[in-house]
Amino acid sequence: MAQVLVVTNRKGGSGKTSTSVNLAAEFAANGRRVLLIDLDTQGHCAIGLGVKAQKDTPTVHGFFDGRHPLSSAIRETPWEGLHLIPADPLFDHGSGSKEELLLRQALASEGILGTHDIIIIDTPPSLDILLLNALYAADRVLVPFIPHFLAGEGVRQLARVLFRVGSRRANEGTRLLVGYVPVKVNLSMASGHKFPS
């Protein structure tokens, strides 16, 4: 059964997509069956993997809008063992289901957890229903952050959401493992030596 890793941060430009794409490619290069789900409507995971956008193809956002099953959006990539569920750049964040467990239920009920070793979910820099769906589906959360004082506020906002989700999951008997990874570290600057608290 697949482990689900969510890569998230409240702040845009924090390296979420680069981290997601590179981890997915590395896991696939090491023989793992990987599925990368792009919840960010910018659609940069597809670009990073060399997958061309195709009109009227199923997307993760079409799943949230109820247009098709999640499994119908799985696409091949040029990387052996690496699949992608692409984003829809025209998705309206106000539309779609408000159910927080929709993604978790679909991953299980559609058999997606059994056909992959690792599922990586790249999230948008927002605190919305898509992020909550990702977090409730997750086994692990990775928070890339730039060690700079402005990035600290986004991490603090996300920590409150992680606490809420973690508390609910603890009541269900499951745990959410969270890790932080500094990115874009400049060791010649003082901020590269200290992490925000």
Segments from the language model and where they lie:
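P-loop NTP-binding core
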Residues: 1-197
